[in-house]
């Protein structure tokens, strides 16, 4: 009996394979989105993720066979999707987040095994793409150097900030010590100024009183001078009048002399 050629796949089988390929690609993109949501990203990485998430499904899925779903994704997109898994372990050097990335890759492998029951070719393509992206993320020296340079720059900035803060604290402490040392002297000088102000006010009052007394004494001296001049005129008039008796003239002269001496004594006091 002649060997018949294999039967062409039915429309239902082709539709099932296409649906399996689309489901595998959707799960891969969902895994990348979950990995990006689990870490804090910068504004540029978020924009890149949005641009990557906006890729249509028709560009990701090549054919119905399910063997080339990720051939349209370039190396940068794959490395950006899996950079959160491997890059921190390389840059930190301590492997703090490496086990977490491996666990996620293992979880993804488990999911791929579950999908392999329906689409083995799609699961194999996903595993190959994940391994290639992880290898590219590890072997990219420029990205590692950029991450290390950014972290070193941030570390230097933190060190400079701490040094500046410590210098400011030392300056504040020094100024506070100077203020504490100068405060008693300032208080003493303020007290001395208050005492000098009170003394100056007393001196001003005394100067005003002495000026008033001087005015009174000047007026009294002027009055005495006028009285002396009047007595001298009287004495000369009595000397001129010699027609009177000698006793009267002598008595008048003596009286005038006594009055003159009394006025001069009062003026001297």
Swiss-Prot record:
Query: Keywords of this protein's UniProt record, alphabetized?
Result: DNA-binding, Nucleus, Transcription, Transcription regulation
Q: What do the Gene Ontology cellular component annotations say?
A: nucleus
Chief place where the protein resides = nucleus
Q: What induces it?
A: By white light.
What tissues contain this protein? Expressed in roots and shoots.
Q: Does the keyword Glycoprotein apply?
A: no
Q: Name one GO molecular function term.
A: DNA-binding transcription factor activity
Q: Where is this region: Leucine-zipper?
A: 168-196
Per the record, which residues fall in region Basic motif?
Answer: 142-161
Give yes or no: UniProt keyword Transcription.
yes
Kindly list the biological process annotations in GO that this record carries: positive regulation of DNA-templated transcription
Protein location: Nucleus
Instruction: Give start and end of each bZIP domain.
Output: 140-196
User: Cross-referenced PROSITE patterns, in alphabetical order?
Assistant: BZIP, BZIP_BASIC
Q: What does this protein do?
A: Transcription regulator.
Q: What is this protein called?
A: Basic leucine zipper 19
- Give the source species: Oryza sativa subsp. japonica (Rice)
- The protein's gene is named BZIP19
């Amino acid at each position: 009996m002649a060997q018949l050629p294999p039967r062409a796949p039915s429309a239902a089988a082709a539709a099932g394979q296409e649906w399996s390929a689309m489901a595998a690609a959707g799960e891969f993109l969902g895994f990348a989105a979950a990995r990006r949501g689990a870490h804090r990203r910068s504004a540029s990485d978020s924009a890149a993720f949005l641009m990557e998430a906006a890729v249509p499904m028709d560009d990701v899925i090549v054919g119905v066979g399910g063997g080339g779903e990720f051939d349209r994704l370039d190396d940068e997109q794959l490395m950006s999707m899996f950079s959160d898994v491997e890059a921190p372990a390389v840059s930190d050097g301590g492997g703090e987040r490496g086990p977490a990335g491996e666990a996620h890759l293992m979880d993804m492998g488990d999911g791929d095994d579950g999908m392999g029951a329906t689409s083995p070719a799609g699961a194999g393509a996903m595993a190959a793409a994940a391994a290639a992206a992880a290898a590219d993320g590890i072997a990219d020296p420029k990205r590692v150097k950029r991450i290390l340079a950014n972290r070193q720059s941030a570390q230097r900035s933190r060190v400079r900030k701490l040094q500046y803060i410590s210098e400011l604290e030392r300056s504040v402490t020094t100024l506070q010590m100077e203020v504490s040392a100068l405060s008693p002297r300032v208080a003493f000088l303020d007290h001395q100024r208050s005492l000098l102000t009170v003394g100056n006010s007393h001196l001003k009052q005394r100067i005003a009183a002495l000026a008033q007394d001087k005015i009174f004494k000047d007026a009294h001296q002027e009055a005495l001078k006028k009285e002396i001049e009047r007595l001298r005129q009287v004495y000369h008039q009595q000397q001129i009048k010699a027609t009177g008796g000698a006793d009267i003239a002598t008595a008048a002269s003596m009286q005038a002399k006594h009055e003159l001496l009394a006025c001069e004594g009062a003026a001297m006091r």
